Amino acid sequence: MLNTVIVGASGYAGAELAALVQNHPQLKLFGLYVSAGSQDAHKRFSSLHPQWVGALDQPLLPLDEDGMTRILTQADLVLLATAHEVSAELAPKFLAKGLPVFDLSGAFRVKDQQFYSSFYGFTHENEQLLEQAAYGLAEWNSDAIAAAQLIAVPGCYPTASLCALKPLQQAGLIAEGWQPIINAVSGVSGAGRKAAINTSFCEVSLSPYGTFNHRHQPEISHHLGKEVLFQPHLGNYVRGILATIYVQMADGVTPTQVDQAFLKAYEGKPLVRLTGQMPSIRGVASTPYCDIAWQQQGNMLVVVSAIDNLLKGAASQAMQCINIKFGFDPATGLI
């Protein structure tokens, strides 16, 4: 059993990680940590997340000097569900002691220091780790994940978008010069637990945000190898992302070629389901799956992708990366 530590366990993604680690046959939940100054320190995990009363009642430990010493000397791997700049500070400390780090923040996803000052509001000081980090898009990057010590788990919108677009891009089916258009909606849990007016019960409404400046647009483009036009929306529901993507196909591309591109890409990869009918949030909420379907008319293609933003868009994809890194079946503990 691998002693597994979660830092940032009070948040939504951290909570999902805790439940997945608890149920994983090869992992032991060794510690749930929050920042030393957190108001949640010493509270029971289940007092914040009552769905796990009686199942996960461990205390949330402060990440103070004693906590760091315990992790550095006794843990086998670390999951970071922390703010981007916090992950950028903590990851090198764990890596220096030989601990594999699986980071759910955006701190190591894009190999460009300027990206972080432009889109994340902090100066990234560790170019070497940016180069060493493996992007944890599990179905597409397993060799790099297995070889790396630092795995940058993709963002939720990028996961939904890249799973839908990479089969087409890899097969060379997208028209030259065409920017795929991604229209995506996420539940309010994507904004985290911190209270805000626009995500409060009486205020939340389907609405666009982040036009031309959302940090996930360059992440998608970087890992697709192609510029995209990305418009996210806040949805008035708890969890899940639905991405509707518009793509112009290269001249002469047939529906059979499109079908074969998706079938080849996801053969033997059970956590991506090619549903044959347009997916829905209901079909993926609280599951580790990405559901994809598509329809072609002439040279235009509509691809729809659905995931749970807290699972396939965060915690369960991190579990896939752990499974790949340690040689387990990628779906272990998930299905």
Swiss-Prot record:
**InterPro entries from the UniProt entry:** AGPR_AS, AGPR_type-1, NAD(P)-bd_dom_sf, NAGSA_dehydrogenase, Semialdehyde_DH_NAD-bd
PROSITE patterns according to UniProt: ARGC
According to UniProt, this protein's pathway is: Amino-acid biosynthesis; L-arginine biosynthesis; N(2)-acetyl-L-ornithine from L-glutamate: step 3/4
- The main enzyme category here is oxidoreductase
What Gene Ontology cellular component terms go with this record? Answer: cytoplasm
- SMART domains, per this entry? Semialdhyde_dh (SM00859)
The primary location reported for this protein is: cytoplasm
Q: Which UniProt keywords apply?
A: Amino-acid biosynthesis, Arginine biosynthesis, Cytoplasm, NADP, Oxidoreductase
GO BP annotations, alphabetical order: L-arginine biosynthetic process
Where it sits in the cell: the answer is: Cytoplasm
* Enzyme Commission code: 1.2.1.38
Q: Annotated Gene Ontology MF terms?
A: N-acetyl-gamma-glutamyl-phosphate reductase activity; NAD binding; NADP+ binding
Q: Does the keyword Acetylation apply?
A: no
Q: Name one Pfam family in it.
A: Semialdhyde_dhC_1
Is-annotated flag, keyword Lipid biosynthesis? no
Catalyzed reactions per annotation: N-acetyl-L-glutamate 5-semialdehyde + phosphate + NADP(+) = N-acetyl-L-glutamyl 5-phosphate + NADPH + H(+)
UniProt-annotated catalytic positions: C156
Report the domain of life of the source organism.
Bacteria
**Reported function:** Catalyzes the NADPH-dependent reduction of N-acetyl-5-glutamyl phosphate to yield N-acetyl-L-glutamate 5-semialdehyde.
Similarity field: Belongs to the NAGSA dehydrogenase family. Type 1 subfamily.
From the Swiss-Prot or TrEMBL record, give the protein name: N-acetyl-gamma-glutamyl-phosphate reductase
Origin species: Aeromonas salmonicida (strain A449)
